[in-house]
């Protein structure tokens, strides 16, 4: 297995108005590993994730993604990962395909690259036959699958998922 450090969190702290949401957290994730950050509500999981995806700056400590500092090199770090938020990030009036096409344009994919990638992802998440229906007709699990396809669209080196199995049936969780 590749021993390249993909994520390196070192003594990370994040405080809000004197409350420590994350307190002296350290861990490493190696390339190719699947890593789950587990803990009770309010333990700082989402705060840690938001730090890794450059939405928050730590109060102290450091976090790097593929060797790049999440504070000093935030723009570069953002090109390295895909993100699937806990909250739905889809427009109910767009079709599944339209969501992916819109994101493809935002990622500056050519129409050909986008069409190829979208076809692959719709097959992967088993939404091919539903791709041209408005998202408002999708079940909760189908919407979650579309969120995952959106996170995978830029072919990221790292995929961050916040509550990845939320709304998925048991078979889809595997």
How should each PLM-predicted stretch be described?
Residues 101, 105, 110-130:
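Conserved ABC ATPase "signature" region
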Residues 148:
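Hydrophobic anchor residue at the start of the ABC signature
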Residues 93, 134-138:
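Conserved ABC ATPase signature
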Residues 155:
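Conserved catalytic motifs of ABC-family nucleotide-binding domains
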Residues 159-162:
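Catalytic Walker B motif of ABC-type/P-loop ATPase nucleotide-binding domains
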Residues 40-44:
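Walker A (P-loop) phosphate-binding loop of ABC-type ATPase nucleotide-binding domains
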